[in-house]
Amino acid sequence: MAAAEEEDGGPEGPNRERGGAGATFECNICLETAREAVVSVCGHLYCWPCLHQWLETRPERQECPVCKAGISREKVVPLYGRGSQKPQDPRLKTPPRPQGQRPAPESRGGFQPFGDTGGFHFSFGVGAFPFGFFTTVFNAHEPFRRGTGVDLGQGHPASSWQDSLFLFLAIFFFFWLLSI
């Protein structure tokens, strides 16, 4: 019966991952065969690139991903085994930093009643002259855009009827404020 267990990969069989000459160990982060294996003082095994990335992304809370014990570069031990081609300490080299990717800016097409500022903004004026309101209404922050026919995304030129309507409402509101 014991011979049958050994042939089919039972608890003591040659197909067990933890036993035999071809034993491999799994990283507790990526769950793959550990490359440049290191062991934490709490006994958990990791790939050094995986653990390095784990530590770099959480600099204020450096804890073991498995048991949440304290962990750092100094609290891991590199593993060396028979047939290891790299006898150097994997902690001394760090994986290369990933390349940055710049996403394309989002287009905010359509009607934008307060210019291209991304929304309405408030400014305080002195006395009866709220200068922030006038600069928002008359687009003083973009003096050269008016009348140039710049396309805002969906075929609406910058000097459309919507600008005139908004200007009329602003002037009406201003005179209403003066009459109060």
UniProtKB/Swiss-Prot annotation:
It is found in: Cell membrane; Mitochondrion membrane; Endoplasmic reticulum membrane. PROSITE patterns: ZF_RING_1 (PS00518), ZF_RING_2 (PS50089). It catalyses: S-ubiquitinyl-[E2 ubiquitin-conjugating enzyme]-L-cysteine + [acceptor protein]-L-lysine = [E2 ubiquitin-conjugating enzyme]-L-cysteine + N(6)-ubiquitinyl-[acceptor protein]-L-lysine. One of its GO terms (cellular component) is endoplasmic reticulum. It is a multi-pass membrane protein. Keywords: Acetylation, Cell membrane, Endoplasmic reticulum, Membrane, Metal-binding, Mitochondrion, Phosphoprotein, Transferase, Transmembrane, Transmembrane helix, Ubl conjugation pathway, Zinc, Zinc-finger. GO terms for molecular function: identical protein binding; protein-containing complex binding; ubiquitin protein ligase activity; ubiquitin-like protein conjugating enzyme binding; ubiquitin-protein transferase activity; zinc ion binding. The modification Phosphoserine is found at residues 84, 107. Its EC number is 2.3.2.27. InterPro entries: RNF5/RNF185-like, Znf_RING, Znf_RING/FYVE/PHD, Znf_RING_CS. Widely expressed. A zinc finger (RING-type) spans 27-68. Residues 79-110 are annotated as: Disordered. Pathway: Protein modification; protein ubiquitination. Coiled coil: none annotated. The modification Phosphothreonine is found at residue 94. It comes from the Eukaryota. Membrane-bound E3 ubiquitin-protein ligase that mediates ubiquitination of target proteins. May function together with E2 ubiquitin-conjugating enzymes UBE2D1/UBCH5A and UBE2D2/UBC4. Mediates ubiquitination of PXN/paxillin,thereby regulating cell motility and localization of PXN/paxillin. Catalyzes ubiquitination of Salmonella type III secreted protein sopA. Interacts with PXN. Interacts with Salmonella typhimurium sopA. Interacts with JKAMP. Interacts with STING1; the interaction of endogenous proteins is dependent on viral infection. Belongs to the RNF5 family. This is E3 ubiquitin-protein ligase RNF5. The gene is RNF5.
